[in-house]
Amino acid sequence: MPKYRSATTTHGRNMAGARALWRATGMTDADFGKPIIAVVNSFTQFVPGHVHLRDLGKLVAEQIEAAGGVAKEFNTIAVDDGIAMGHGGMLYSLPSRELIADSVEYMVNAHCADAMVCISNCDKITPGMLMASLRLNIPVIFVSGGPMEAGKTKLSDQIIKLDLVDAMIQGADPKVSDSQSDQVERSACPTCGSCSGMFTANSMNCLTEALGLSQPGNGSLLATHADRKQLFLNAGKRIVELTKRYYEQNDESALPRNIASKAAFENAMTLDIAMGGSTNTVLHLLAAAQEAEIDFTMSDIDKLSRKVPQLCKVAPSTQKYHMEDVHRAGGVIGILGELDRAGLLNRDVKNVLGLTLPQTLEQYDVMLTQDDAVKNMFRAGPAGIRTTQAFSQDCRWDTLDDDRANGCIRSLEHAYSKDGGLAVLYGNFAENGCIVKTAGVDDSILKFTGPAKVYESQDDAVEAILGGKVVAGDVVVIRYEGPKGGPGMQEMLYPTSFLKSMGLGKACALITDGRFSGGTSGLSIGHVSPEAASGGSIGLIEDGDLIAIDIPNRGIQLQVSDAELAARREAQEARGDKAWTPKNRERQVSFALRAYASLATSADKGAVRDKSKLGG
């Protein structure tokens, strides 16, 4: 009998009770010698990115059992950041990542499962499952629900592409008519799937490809397209092979920590920078690396950001391209191919298919492959039909986008910019760094200096922006919204969207110890570390202080003397128990969120829990 983890509950006379319960789930004597594989689903009717997942777990389970395994499905929670946005619900989004990771650990370890297929999709679900996978270190394959089709509507006699962010911006723009706002709202999110731009969900699903834990096409193949079904069928078959390789052949190369190595993490971050992914991916990669016991830090990200160019530009950084266009251009593998030809990737990595990076590129890079089936898969396109059904259409682009000079994905020679889409800035109130999505910053404001307008909650900042109290040239500072201070590190999509609505998108900066939605663009600097609630110097900024931002030189500076900052710190400490807390904010915080805050670290550590507080 192979040394399967599940043998703990399926073998031995003393496990008669456990076997009796397994039998009640449908298992038979023949099943007790097979690996038990958890199908970790995240179906919910609350989230368009997950509304179509109900039957997909069964699809995977059937393949697992046909290949000689026993499949057992369970679900995690899934928070929709877009619906939770702009009110107290956003306090729960980032903490849900830890809850998801823990719930996967609880279920898998409580029942001694041997391996997992993780069916994820949206913002915190993929990271939570990724953290759990690297924590547990048992064979795993990720297969996500896939991206939503881009919205489309006709405005001023022109067909334009839309997404969730457009609905937010137009809904708050006083110059937009009610009828146009309603038209955009009804058109922005037409199908099931994760929101159609390079937002957090799609960024993370792309990164699982670069980490080697999902199959080619996972990050870009539309949720509605019939071709996506094959990813689920393959995952069910392949996970049984990986499981048997590890348990029966003692092949540790099948384990996620050996696939998602430090070299793979560097490749994933390189991809993220090149494609202008969400800043949230920085948080999640840092957190996942800690679970894998990999020394991967903000310093590594900073080094990569200084040498990786931007080779792909997608909404929200441009409305020309959405995920369906990235797929047509070759998807994640297409971007990795250009990065490899530029000499920017670690080649000694493998994926869950057992392929090295060169082998993967040879087979799946549209610029290299001779496989017509692969080319056909990357021509999978949108149908433009409203639906919540997976695999419901089989439309295809007439041609691939293989124009590496002017297309969606560019070669090094024709890069959108020599600097990548993300940058780490350091300065006297961001000693441990902060993050900006440079892909979404207009060239005219890469260097920016202005007076601070300080707010101690997102709500106050939104009220000020919509009330006309923020003017061109201002630097909006929103603090005490970090992991501990919020708690929960809210996304600031509404403040950044409303700045655009008020015509200030290229005239103001926004700085926060909170974070941003993947849908954010503009001069939006987040993850300021240490956060205000941890004694960070962002808590010392006062209205009118000049703040200088210098993205090309990776700097951010509060133009106040060291002596003055020391005096302000002394005054803050003199507040005693009230030190490093908001002065005028009333916010009801539940016990669950207070428990999260008590262990939360700042963003530069991935906003994970501080194990040292538990003696770990």
Curated annotation (Swiss-Prot):
Transmembrane segments: none annotated. Belongs to the IlvD/Edd family. Binds 1 [2Fe-2S] cluster per subunit. This cluster acts as a Lewis acid cofactor. It comes from the Bacteria. The active site is at S517. It is an enzyme of class 4 (lyase). Pathway: Amino-acid biosynthesis; L-isoleucine biosynthesis; L-isoleucine from 2-oxobutanoate: step 3/4; Amino-acid biosynthesis; L-valine biosynthesis; L-valine from pyruvate: step 3/4. Its EC number is 4.2.1.9. The modification N6-carboxylysine is found at K124. [2Fe-2S] cluster binds at C122, C195. Signal peptide: none annotated. It holds the Pfam family ILV_EDD_C. This is Dihydroxy-acid dehydratase. PANTHER family: D-XYLONATE DEHYDRATASE, D-XYLONATE DEHYDRATASE YAGF-RELATED. GO terms for biological process: isoleucine biosynthetic process; L-valine biosynthetic process. Its cofactor is [2Fe-2S] cluster; Mg(2+). GO terms for cellular component: cytosol. Homodimer. GO terms for molecular function: 2 iron, 2 sulfur cluster binding; dihydroxy-acid dehydratase activity; magnesium ion binding. Keywords: 2Fe-2S, Amino-acid biosynthesis, Branched-chain amino acid biosynthesis, Iron, Iron-sulfur, Lyase, Magnesium, Metal-binding. Functions in the biosynthesis of branched-chain amino acids. Catalyzes the dehydration of (2R,3R)-2,3-dihydroxy-3-methylpentanoate (2,3-dihydroxy-3-methylvalerate) into 2-oxo-3-methylpentanoate (2-oxo-3-methylvalerate) and of (2R)-2,3-dihydroxy-3-methylbutanoate (2,3-dihydroxyisovalerate) into 2-oxo-3-methylbutanoate (2-oxoisovalerate), the penultimate precursor to L-isoleucine and L-valine, respectively. It catalyses: (2R)-2,3-dihydroxy-3-methylbutanoate = 3-methyl-2-oxobutanoate + H2O; (2R,3R)-2,3-dihydroxy-3-methylpentanoate = (S)-3-methyl-2-oxopentanoate + H2O. It comes from Shigella boydii serotype 18 (strain CDC 3083-94 / BS512). Mg(2+) binds at D81, D123, K124, E491.
